[in-house]
Amino acid sequence: MEINGRTGFFCLIGSPVGHSGSPAMYNYSFQKTEQDYVYLAFDVDLDKTEEAVSALKALGCKGFNVTMPCKTKVAELADELSDAAELIGACNTVVVKDGKLHGHNTDGIGFVRNLKEHGADVKDKVITVMGAGGAATAIQVQAALEGAKKIYIFNCKDKFYANAENTARKIENKVPGVTVEVYPLEDSQKLYEKIKERDRKSVV
């Protein structure tokens, strides 16, 4: 790959990023497709997120990926959010277009697409998800956006339980036709009942 005065750049921000395989993957892709871009990784702490994002815009960055701990802050800074990013309250991908930040969250999209490719479309299905962290929340939101009729969320009674309840409220307020129920993961009988309740149209 030959970098010149016209080479555009994309990047990853967050902390830590030294272990990330994204630069190798994207730079290989740019090279194979003969695109004049480079992908970098910048270690950015939460308190430096706004400053870093402003710098990326000023430098003409085409877009960037976001990892922890910056995802929520970047969602707050974005000019526009996709439906998923707005419901999740976090971004992992930002497209910079005409000086504006367009925030997306692709975690749930990837998971739900993989289900569909393997014959499990979530539309009109009953979904049971164990967990309420970032990835689980993204899956719950994307399942709702793609037409799931009911979502059961099970999570331990820890700091993420309130997040599960908040996600349920947001989904029901923003996505018509879907019901979301939250239960403690410690309630094994309830978990058994909800999984047993599911029919051939269900996904766990």
Where are these regions (language model features)?
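Glycine-rich phosphate/diphosphate-binding loop of Rossmann-like nucleotide-binding domains
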Residues: 123-199
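Phosphate/diphosphate ligand-binding glycine-rich loop within oxidoreductases
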Residues: 2-118
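Conserved small/polar residues in nucleotide/adenosyl-binding loops
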Residues: 201-204
